Curated annotation (Swiss-Prot):
Any one GO molecular function term: metal ion binding
Binding note for cofactor: Binds 2 manganese ions per subunit.
Keyword check for Chaperone: no
Family, as annotated: Belongs to the peptidase M24B family.
Organism per entry: Mycoplasma pneumoniae (strain ATCC 29342 / M129 / Subtype 1)
EC number: 3.4.11.9
PROSITE patterns the record matches: PROLINE_PEPTIDASE
Record bears the keyword Manganese: yes
EC primary class: hydrolase
Cited Gene3D superfamilies: Creatinase/methionine aminopeptidase superfamily (3.90.230.10), Creatinase/prolidase N-terminal domain (3.40.350.10)
Short name of any one Pfam family annotated for the protein: Creatinase_N
Binding site residues for Mn(2+) 1: 224, 290, 319, 333
This protein's name: Putative Xaa-Pro aminopeptidase
Length: 354
């Protein structure tokens, strides 16, 4: 823990140096947990050149003092004036704040602390996962795999989307997950044409393709997997069978392409080019993927607009899809650990339709 904390502080100190800033104020639950390893629903971290201060209220104070590395000075939070006094004491003239977690109250608080502040994308600091984070993600993917194996056999004609979604939720917890990382998506038949369909009372029929997008949380870290399963042995729509094969091809190409030599946009293009060269060119309507970690969607993105190189040990999804209005849809989503040349396919053992 101590070594990882020092590595994380090195990331933050470089951010301070690059932005010519004196301190970073962290108010989000995710980044507070990322730095300290201590889960809490409130608190303020001030990372400055001398040390790290955590201001946390009475619900967590005693536990935090015991659990958190001594490099972090834990203080009982009673008033915002404590944070302001610290900033004045260490000479904070330029403050970095988390733009992606910015609330109205947070912004008003910032104005009182420091006249000059810079909004940063705080998720960027978590792009490169450390060994303990990778272990947690591997574990949460394994929990998800266990449920997916059962799910493929479980889905039967006559079941509703809602029933299947609730079953997934229950099974993820039984398998060791803390809770859903997001509400499961279950879409059968024509409902599959809506990428973020909300499960309904529509019943599955034999020959349907059923898209199931689900994940859970382990030690704070999320999984995000999609499988489109065939119910029965023969599809009732040959167009969707062709679409499945094309999505599968694009998905595998993206998994094989992901590495530190490519940008998120370039990996997106690998998948997108395969679908756009087919009869389904008009039906891939979202980005290829995104980062996964303490947030279900975080940096880096695998999209047409993400022109940064993927960094080693980033965890991303590869999730191309085809969505044909009034017909149905196919999506296959996997999680990948980015490496220099050959990335690690984390979800390789999660079953597919064929």
């Amino acid at each position: 823990m101590h070594n990882e904390l020092q590595q994380k502080l090195a990331v933050l100190h470089k951010l301070l140096q690059d932005n010519k800033a004196d301190a970073i104020l962290i108010g989000s639950d995710q980044n507070r947990f990322w730095l300290t390893g201590f889960p809490s629903s409130a608190g303020w971290l001030v990372v400055h050149k001398q040390r790290v201060n955590l201001f946390i209220d009475g619900r967590y104070f005693e536990a935090a003092k015991t659990a958190i590395d001594p490099l972090v000075k834990v203080e009982l939070f009673t008033t915002y004036k404590q944070v302001k006094a610290l900033c004045e004491q260490v000479g904070v003239k330029h403050l970095l704040i988390e733009g992606d977690y910015l609330t109205f109250n947070y912004q008003n608080f910032i104005k009182e602390l420091c006249a000059q502040y810079t909004v940063i994308n705080a998720q960027e600091i978590r792009r490169q996962k450390l060994p303990s984070e990778i272990l947690a993600i591997e574990k949460v993917v394994e929990i998800t795999r266990k449920v997916a194996v059962k799910l493929k056999r479980f889905i039967q004609p006559g079941m509703t989307e809602l029933f299947i979604a609730q079953w997934i939720t229950d099974q993820l917890v039984k398998a060791g997950g803390a809770k859903n990382s997001f509400d499961p998506i279950v879409a059968t038949g024509k409902n599959g044409a809506n990428p973020h369909h909300k499960p309904s009372k529509l019943k599955v029929k034999s020959g349907d393709f059923v898209t199931c997008d689900f994940g859970t949380i382990y030690n704070g870290y999320c999984s995000d997997i999609t499988r489109t399963f065939l119910v029965g042995k023969k599809p009732n729509n040959e167009v969707l069978l062709k679409a499945y094969k094309k999505v599968d091809e694009a998905n595998m190409a993206g998994i094989n392409a992901a590495n530190t030599q490519l940008t998120g946009a370039e990996v997106d293009k690998v998948c997108r080019d395969i679908i756009e060269a087919s009869e389904f060119k008009d039906y891939f309507v979202h980005s290829t993927g995104h980062g996964v970690g303490l947030d279900i969607h975080e940096m880096p993105n695998v999209s047409t607009s993400y022109n940064k190189l993927l960094c080693e040990n980033a965890v991303i999804t590869i999730e191309p899809g085809i969505y044909i209005p009034s017909v149905g849809g196919i999506r296959i989503e996997d999680m990948v650990l980015v490496k220099d040349h050959k990335s690690v396919w984390l979800s390789a053992k999660i079953p597919r339709a064929f």
